Amino acid sequence: MSKVTFKITLTSDPRLPYKVLCVPENTPFTAVLKFAAEEFKVPAATSAIITNDGIGLNPAQTAGNVFLKHGSELRLIPRDRVGSC
């Protein structure tokens, strides 16, 4: 089974920390999003992953498809403060 590697950067932190994740290519991307959010200690339910160009990703696909379409460098955006007063 082939694996794909993602470098996921946390955009909400000014230091821009990142994690490198290596997962089987048939892994649901929702699992990658959930794991990355847990690693950064942000809520997965209110987080999104985008490309470096700012394009949002639909998590309802495999990690292999995301890798082929968008490459390995992605950004995690916690949306916990969006719309709050």
Swiss-Prot record:
The cross-link Glycyl lysine isopeptide (Gly-Lys) (interchain with K-? in acceptor proteins) sits at 83
Is Flavoprotein among this UniProt entry's keywords?
A: no
Enumerate the subcellular locations listed in this protein's record, separating them with semicolons.
Nucleus; Cytoplasm
List keywords of the entry alphabetically.
Cytoplasm, Isopeptide bond, Nucleus, Ubl conjugation, Ubl conjugation pathway
Cross-referenced SUPFAM superfamilies: Ubiquitin-like
PTM annotation = UFM1 precursor is cleaved by UFSP1, promoting its maturation: processing of the C-terminal Ser-Cys dipeptide is required to expose its C-terminal conserved Gly residue.
Q: Which residues form the propeptide?
A: 84-85
Main subcellular localization, coarse class? nucleus
Q: Where is this cross-link: Glycyl lysine isopeptide (Lys-Gly) (interchain with G-Cter in UFM1)?
A: 69
Which GO terms are recorded in the biological process aspect for this UniProt protein?
A: protein K69-linked ufmylation; protein ufmylation; response to endoplasmic reticulum stress; reticulophagy
The cellular component terms of Gene Ontology attached to this UniProt record, alphabetical and capped at eight, are: cytoplasm; nucleus
Give the UniProt family note.
Answer: Belongs to the UFM1 family.
Q: How does it assemble?
A: Interacts with uba5. Interacts with ufc1.
Function in brief: Ubiquitin-like modifier which can be covalently attached via an isopeptide bond to lysine residues of substrate proteins as a monomer or a lysine-linked polymer. The so-called ufmylation, requires the ufm1-activating E1 enzyme uba5, the ufm1-conjugating E2 enzyme ufc1, and the ufm1-ligase E3 enzyme ufl1. Ufmylation is involved in various processes, such as ribosome recycling, response to DNA damage, transcription or reticulophagy (also called ER-phagy) induced in response to endoplasmic reticulum stress.
Q: What is this protein called?
A: Ubiquitin-fold modifier 1
Question: Where does this protein come from, organism-wise?
Answer: Xenopus tropicalis (Western clawed frog)
